[in-house]
Amino acid sequence: MILITGGRAQGKRAFWEKNIASGEGEPSEISGLWIRGGQTSFDECLDSPYVCEFHLFIRRLLLGEPSLNAPDWVYGTMEKRNGCRLPDREALTERLFKACPGRVLVTDEIGLGIVPLDPFEREYREETGRICCLLAARSEQVWRVPC
């Protein structure tokens, strides 16, 4: 897996398409293959080799959004906290690696700046950071794009 992280609108996908994906086709061919975590189903996100907006996928998991169609195993035995359905982080990251080991995953780095007053927003930042740390620890490459 290759994890690419950075601030919002920093050109993370374009960085991948232009500088790294040279052996996988033209950038225009690859740009149509991205699955958006804020819009896709759980299974599509699990199986896709190119996932962007992964932080929004995690947000949807925490909200228990019905359109995500997340299976029950992803939540494990964790209870709700601050309005969040907490996922089983280890099971989720394991499944992501097993389903598509060569995946390129792009996520926004959302843990910087002022800590939000809203308990859900704090929980969202914390869970996203912890899941991304687990992914980074096992990824072949981790790129931080600071533009």
What does each of the following model-derived ranges do?
Residues 1-38:
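Glycine-rich P-loop/Walker A and Walker A-like loops and their local beta1-loop-alpha1 context
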Residues 10, 56-57, 111:
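Short, solvent-exposed loop/turn segments at secondary-structure junctions
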Residues 13-15, 60-62, 115-117:
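Short glycine-/acidic-enriched loop or helix-start segments at secondary-structure transitions
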Residues 19, 24, 66, 121-124:
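Alpha-helix termini
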Residues 24-101:
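Conserved inter-motif catalytic segment of the P-loop NTP-binding fold
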